[in-house]
Amino acid sequence: MAVSLNDFISVKLKRYSRESPWERLRVPYRNKKQKKWASVHNNEAQLHSANKRNDNCLIQRSSTWRLGDMITLVIKDIPVTWLSNEGGKLYNLWEPLHDYGTIEFMKINEPLNGQTSTTAIVQFAPPPKVPFWEPNGKINVKGVDLAVQIDITAHRSHISRQVFSKNSFRSDQLVKIPLSSFKLGQVYDERIVPLFGVDCGITVTESNLLVYFNFKKLCVLFDASFDKQIETFRLDFDFHSIIGDVGTDYYDDHISLVFRFRFSPLIFRKSKNATESRVQTFWTASHLWRRHYDILPFNVSPTTASPIELLNCHNAPIGRCNVLVLSFSIRDESDKDDIAFLLHNLEKFNLKSQLDKVVFHLVPDYKHRCSLINDKEIEEEIAYLLQACLSKNLLSEIDLPIILANLKKLSKERAKKFLRLILTSKTALINPSELDFTKSFVFYDLSSASSIHIKKLYVTPTTLRIVEDSLEAGNRVIRNFKDFANRFMRVQITDEYYKQKIRGGSDGFRNEKLYSRIQQLLTYGIKVGNQIYEFLAFGNSQLREHGAYFFASGSDLNAKQIREWMGDFSEINSVSKYAARMGQCFSTTKEINRFCVDISLQDDIVRNNHCFTDGVGMASLSVIRRLSLEVKNHDMFPSAFQFRMGGYKGVLSLAPPTKLEYHQGNLVFPRRSQDKFKSFHSTLEVIKISRFSNAHLNMQLITLLEGLGVEKTVFLELTRSQLSKMNESINSKQKSILMLRDNVDEYHSTLIIADFIQAGFLERDDAFTENLLNLYYEWVLRLIKEKQKVSVPKGAYLLGVADETGTLKGHYDDAVLSVPEIFIQITDTSTSFGSYSTGKLKTRVIVGLCIVARNPSLHPGDVRVCKAVRCDELMHLKNVIVFPTTGDRSIPAMCSGGDLDGDEYTVIWDQRLLPKIVNYPPLLESSPKKSIDFLEGKPLIDSVKEFFVNYIKYDSLGLISNAWKAWAHDHDNNPEGIFGNVCLELAEMHSKAVDFAKSGVACKMQAKYHPKRYPDFMQKTKTRSFRSETAVGKIFRYAARFQRESGRPATYNPIMNTVYDPCMKLPRFKTEYLNVAEEVKKHYDNDLRSIMARFDISTEYEVYTAFILFKDDLAKTVNEYGLREEVSFQFDLLKKKYTQEYLEKCALSNQSAFDSSEYEERINSAVAATYDVTYDQRVKSVGNGTTEVLISFPYLFSSRLCQLSRKAMLTANNF
C-alpha cells in the first residue's frame, strides 16, 4: 500500500479506547465490565475483613487477570531463612516463575519481629500465559507451599491506564512501535553510510522502537542471532544528544525516521539469568540489562590483549556512528496514527520533523579504509591531530585514502596547521578535494616557558574522543621531562557524553563489561597513530574525575623510569596511599624558579590524639613576598598558600611577626604531618594563594541549618533580597556595582565587571560589559533555582590555617556550651570603588558569633558555631580563617572531617542564620581506617591499576548524596529529617565514600537506603516526585516563578551592538600598533575557540568569567566546580600568554626604552589599538549579518582599559 505525504499529514490524532471495534474482541462491553467489577468489590470486602494486612482480592478461578497488560501477585508464607546471606532471597522466586512469563518487578518484605514467614510481590508484564497458581492458589518452591494472591488494586490501575494501538502500545509516557528495520551509520556528504544494523553483517530477528518521554530517551530493542544463539540488545539515545530536526521519508508501504546524534548510544545486553537477585530484596527487570561496549554474544569476551584504538576494524563500529535510521511498515491507518502520535509528542521536546530523503551510500571496503590510520609514513603529531579530527566527526575515515595522500604532500608544519584549523573551525570537511589542502591558512602555535601543551583524550564505552592539545601550567613531572612533553597524555574515562562519569555504586554489577574495557585500557594502553600510551599515574583530583596520566614509552624513557624519578615510596604499604603520594607530583603548580628556601621541620601540635596543625606550616615574609611577585597577585600579599615541595604538601601561612627568628631569610617551616614521602626535589611550587570570596548557602547547608532550628523565612528573605537587588541593578550603575562587590566569586569575575561599570563602559553601551552583566544575572538565577546557591553578604569562603600563637580559645568537651574562637580579617571590597583594579584594598575584622562549615556537609554536627574575635597577635593574617590550636579537639576535623592542607571553609556572621541547636555532636570515626594491601607476586603498579578500576566501580559518592537529599526532605517517610537514622547513616556512609580515594575501602549503599520518592527541587520523574515544603523547596519554586515573571530571557542571549567607545580615541600612538593587534588577535581567537570547543561552551563571555551555563539536561550531572576551575585555569593561562605576547610584539615589554610618561601613553595606545581592531571586525561582521566575531581580546587588559576610561572621563569633565 503506497503512502503519500498528504495521507500522513491528514492523520487525525486520536486515542484508542476500549470502545474501539477491534478492542471489543478483547474486552467486555462497559456494562458487563462494571458488573464484573461489582463482584470484585464484594470479594475484596470479604477478604479485607478476613485479613487486615492485605486488602486485595484473592481470585482463584476468575479470568479477569488476563485483561490487563500487567498483573501483580502477592506471594505469602515465604520462610525467613530465604533472607539470610546464603538463603537465595528473590532468586528463589525468579528461577521457577520466569518460565511462565516476563517478570517486571519483585520485592520481598522484611518480616516483623518474631515472624517465621514473610511476603513478596511479583509483577508480570504482560500477564503469564497460564495461571500457574490454580486450582488451589498455591505454588511449591523448594519444597515449600506458598500462597498466591492477585493484587486487584494494582491490577485495576493498570487496566484503566491502557492505551492500545493495533500493532503497538502508546501513552503519554511511553511509545512502543515494531520496526521493519533499523540502521546505524555515518552522515557522509548528505548521504548515509550504514555501518551497523539490518543488512550490515548482523542478523536481526526482531526489533522495536521504545520512546520514554518521561526519561527523554528513545531505545532500539532488537534480537541478534549469533550461530543459532539469540541475544537481546538495547541501544539508548538521550533526547539531548539528538541534533536538529527528525528527518522523515516516505516510500511505498514504509516510512523512515532519521535521527542525527552527537554521542554514541548506550549499549545494553539482556542477561538470561537474574543471578544478582540472590543477594537482593528488591529487583526489577532493568537489572537484567548489562552495559556493553559492543554487540557480541554473552560467551564472547570483547576485550583483547591489544591497546584501545579509535578505529576498531574487528567489531561493529557503533562508536563511529552519528545517525540512526528507523523504518516502519505501514499496513493500515493505525500504523500511520502511531507514527503521527510519536512525531507529535517529540515536538513537545523541540524535536520537530521535516522531509529528509534517505539516500544510502555503501562503502564495502570500510574496514580497509580504517586500517589506513596506522600508516607509518605519517608523523606522530600529525597522526594525533588527524585522529582528533576523526573523533569529532570533522573528518571521516571514509576519506582516509585522499586525506593521507594529500597530507603526505604537505610539509610537517603545514599539515599540522591544516588539521588544527579544522579542529578550531568546528566545520566538517567531508569528501575533500586536493584544493582544500592547498588553501592559504595561518595558525599560531601557543607555547611559553610557563605553559606546556599536553595531549588529552576521553575514553568512552564505544569510542575515543581526542581533543587538541590541552594547555597546561605544568606540574613537577612534565616540567622535568619537558623534552618529552608531547609523549604525555591526560586520559579521562567517561560515559558516552564525555562530561558524565560512568556510574558506579549500586550499578556496578551491571557495568562489568565496561570495567573490563577500563582494565584493557590500563593493561595495554591506548594506540594513537603508531604510538602506544601506557598508564603512568594519577593525582587525587584526577582519580575523583576518573582520570590518569599516560605516557608513550620508548627506548630513551619509559613510564617506570618516570615513576622512579618521582620519589621513594617504598615505606608506603597501602595501595591507595601509594597512588596518592605519586599523584602529589602531578598537582598543577607554579614553580618558583631560582629561589632557594631553607627548610626547618616542625612538630605538629597534637592533643588527645587530635592534630591541630594537620597539613599546615609556616613561611617567612620574604617567601610570601617573592611568591606574590611570581604569581602576579594584584591583591595584597597573600597570608597563606597551598604548596608542593619534594614530598611535602599542604599549606604554608605567614609566620607571626613577633617570632623574629622565623623571618631571618627565605625560610619555610613544614610540619611532620606534611611530610608524605622522600624526594630529592626541593623547589617550592604553588597551587593556589589565599583570596577572599563571598559565602554561599547550598542545598545541603540550608537543609542542615533548617533542621538545626533556623526559620525557613530567613532563607527566603536572603533569596528575595539577592534577586530583587539584581532586578534593581538593571537600571542603576551604583546598585550594579554594589551588587557585584557584595557577591565576589572565587575567580573575582564580579569585581572585574564592577570595575568596567564603574569606569563607565556600561553607560556608554559597551557590548562586552553588557553581555557580562546579562550572563551574570542568568548564571545566578540558574544556580539559585537548580542548586539553591544563595549568596550571603555577611559571610566569606576562606582558606583555613592554624593559630601559631596559641591565643585563640579552642573547643573543650567538658564545657557546658563550648563556643571556640576564630579570627577573620577580610578584604572590604565595598569601601572603595575601583579598588580592585588599582590594588588599593582595605580590610576589616569580623567580631561576633559565626557558623563555620565545609563542603560537603551532611551531618548535623558538621555545622559549628564559633565566636569571631579581634586578636592583635593575628593581625598579619588576612583573607583566611584562623582556627585555634588549643582545646580538646580540632575544629576543622569536626567540619565533615576537614583539615588544613588546602581545605576552604564557609564562615557566616549573619545572626539570622545562627542555629537554635548549637554544636550538635560531630560525626566521629566508628572504626579505624582500613587500607588495601598490594597484590602478591605482581608489580606494584598492577595494584594501583586494580585500585583505579575498583574506585570507578564502587564510586558511590553521588548516589549517597542524592539519597540523603531525598530522605532529608521526605518527612512522610522520615519524620525526623536530618536527625533520622537513615540520614545519619547516609551521612556516615558519605564520609567513608569521600575517604575512599585515600583509604581504598569502598562504601556500598544497600538497597534499603534508596529513596522512596524525591522532592520536586531534584527534578526527577513526576511519578516519584513530591512537593517539598522545606526551605529548599520554597526557594526552588520562588526562583522558578521569578524567572517566569521577571521578564528576563529564560536562557542567556548575547547582545551585539556597534557603538564605538569615544574613550578609545585619545591615545596618540594607536596607529603604530594596529597591525600587531590584528595579528595577535587572530591567534588569540583561534585558541579561545579551541577552549570553547573543548569544553562545549557556547560563548566567549562564559570562558572569560567562568560563569558557565550548562544545558538543562546536563546541569545536574556535570561536575560544575571542577569544570569551572579547569576553564578558569585554561583562560588564565591564555590571558597571561597573550597579554605578554602582545606587549612583546609592540616592543613594550621593557619599560627602560622610554621615559615613564611616554611608556604609559604607549601602553594605553597599544590597548586602544586592540579595541579598534576588534570594533572594526565587529562592525564588518554585523554588516554581513553574522555575529561570530570574538570581541574579548581588548578586555584581557581590563585594568588598563579602566585606567584609559577614567582618564578620558576626567579629561572630558575638565572641559
From Swiss-Prot:
Function: Has a role in the RNA interference (RNAi) pathway which is important for heterochromatin formation, accurate chromosome segregation, centromere cohesion and telomere function during mitosis and meiosis. Required for both post-transcriptional and transcriptional gene silencing. Required for silencing at the centromeres and for initiation of transcriptionally silent heterochromatin at the mating type locus. Promotes histone H3 'Lys-10' methylation necessary for centromere function. Required for recruitment of swi6 and cohesin to an ectopic dg repeat.
Disulfide bond sites: none
Compartmental location: Cytoplasm; Nucleus; Chromosome, Telomere; Chromosome, Centromere
Subunit structure: Cid12, hrr1 and rdp1 interact forming the RNA-directed RNA polymerase complex (RDRC). The RDRC complex interacts with the RITS complex via interaction between ago1 and hrr1. Clr4 has a role in mediating this interaction.
Entry's Gene Ontology BP terms: chromosome segregation; co-transcriptional gene silencing by RNA interference machinery; negative regulation of G0 to G1 transition; regulatory ncRNA-mediated heterochromatin formation; silent mating-type cassette heterochromatin formation; siRNA processing; siRNA-mediated pericentric heterochromatin formation
Gene designation per UniProt: rdp1
Gene Ontology MF terms in the entry: RNA binding; RNA-directed RNA polymerase activity
EC number(s) stated in the UniProt entry for this protein: 2.7.7.48
Protein name, entry field: RNA-dependent RNA polymerase 1
Ranges in a coiled coil: none
InterPro entries linked to this entry: RNA-dep_RNA_pol_euk-typ
Pfam families linked to this entry: RdRP
Segments crossing the lipid bilayer: none
Catalytic activity: RNA(n) + a ribonucleoside 5'-triphosphate = RNA(n+1) + diphosphate
Keywords, in A-Z order: Centromere, Chromosome, Chromosome partition, Cytoplasm, Nucleotidyltransferase, Nucleus, RNA-binding, RNA-directed RNA polymerase, RNA-mediated gene silencing, Telomere, Transferase
Protein family: Belongs to the RdRP family.
Any one cellular-component term (Gene Ontology): cytosol
